[in-house]
């Protein structure tokens, strides 16, 4: 179990392990809940290897519901905090993805960052991995990655962000001396203009947004339909399912969400913070009722709220803040933010000493 916060290059290590162990003739697979990173790596490799060979290196986390014990040499579970209990489209297959991965592999490696759990169905935690290991009678070795490579190598930016989003108390009340370009934009058009300009160098800048706008099935491949509307500004959610969002040159004029960006990194990102987070009475407030109806990350929360409203609001608050923390840490060199809530924008500007 490898604990690693955002930017510690856990995915780079996982991919290098995949290459090294494959070179040693071991049967090894890279596993993730999120399809987006797998799609990117498959796309990059398919010019060099046969399609079947590449596809067999990368698997979804629900691939091991019936796998025999130790049938794989090593499974590298990236973004293990995103693992679910059940598998399948309707989450009704299998028993527990953590236990199934441990069962299927002689050696399983879980890369985990609990602060990136972003849906109600995410069960990946240190406690759950230990529980799965105990059930499978497996030895567990714990490690931690501490060096920060994203956000210009600045742990200070991550600590500042935790303080700003009121995720946890840190000593980082400002970004003095930290080499990271973060700006609050006065309009989404201004934010998009900066990101498009930054993208010209290497096709490594993207716009991301909180899931506060619906993504209707009927228009998901319609380039002329703009799902996100803010005043006279509009933009489409990522097209074609969004799995190639990070590498398709056309996607610079689309907005990605947590599901198409988690596990990936860019040089620069533009982030639209929607109505699910605002600043009110001196506090950063979240509101899960402002999430889009097509967003499944909080599916079932209204039913849970009838049983324990206070606990549900606490869980939703954590998920929403984790989501924006994740979106705001995808950029290695900079992040440009637009907030639909004017008070939240002013709050961030004050923290950044931005006029």
Question: How should these model regions be labeled?
Answer:
Residues 2:
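Hydrophobic anchor at the beta1->P-loop junction of P-loop NTPases
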Residues 10-11:
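Conserved lysine of the Walker
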Residues 23-50, 60-68:
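AAA+/P-loop NTPase substrate/partner-engagement loops
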Residues 14, 119-124, 136-159, 166-285:
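Conserved helicase/translocase motor-coupling segment
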């Amino acid at each position: 179990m490898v604990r690693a916060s955002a930017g510690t290059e856990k995915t780079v290590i996982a991919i290098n392990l995949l290459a090294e162990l494959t070179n040693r003739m071991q049967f090894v697979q890279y596993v993730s809940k999120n399809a987006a990173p797998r799609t990117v790596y498959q796309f990059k490799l398919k010019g060099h290897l046969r399609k079947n060979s590449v596809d067999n290196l990368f698997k979804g986390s629900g691939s091991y519901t019936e796998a025999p014990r130790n049938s794989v040499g090593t499974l590298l579970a990236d973004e293990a905090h995103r693992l679910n209990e059940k598998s399948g489209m309707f989450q009704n297959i299998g028993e527990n993805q953590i236990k199934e991965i441990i069962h299927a592999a002689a050696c399983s490696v879980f890369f985990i960052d609990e602060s990136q759990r972003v849906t109600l169905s995410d069960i990946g935690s240190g406690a759950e991995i230990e529980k799965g290991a105990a059930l499978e009678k497996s030895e567990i070795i714990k490690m931690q990655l501490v060096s920060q490579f994203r956000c210009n190598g600045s742990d200070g930016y991550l600590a500042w962000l935790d303080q700003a989003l009121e995720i946890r108390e840190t000593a980082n009340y400002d970004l003095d001396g930290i080499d990271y370009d973060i700006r609050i934009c006065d309009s989404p058009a201004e934010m998009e203009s900066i990101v498009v300009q930054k993208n010209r160098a290497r096709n490594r800048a993207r716009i991301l947004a909180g899931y506060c706008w619906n993504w209707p099935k009927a228009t998901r491949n319609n380039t002329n339909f703009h799902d996100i509307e803010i005043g006279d500004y509009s933009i489409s959610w990522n097209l074609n399912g969004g799995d190639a969002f990070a590498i398709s040159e056309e996607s610079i004029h689309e907005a990605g969400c947590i599901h198409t960006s988690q596990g990936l990194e860019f040089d620069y990102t533009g982030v639209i913070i929607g109505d699910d987070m605002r600043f009110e009475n001196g506090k950063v407030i979240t509101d899960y009722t402002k999430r889009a109806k097509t967003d499944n990350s909080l599916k079932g929360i209204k039913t849970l709220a009838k049983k324990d409203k206070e606990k549900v609001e606490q869980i939703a608050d954590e998920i929403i803040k984790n989501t924006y923390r994740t979106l705001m840490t995808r950029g290695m060199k900079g992040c440009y933010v637009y907030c639909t809530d004017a008070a939240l924008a002013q709050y961030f500007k004050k923290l950044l000493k931005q006029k």
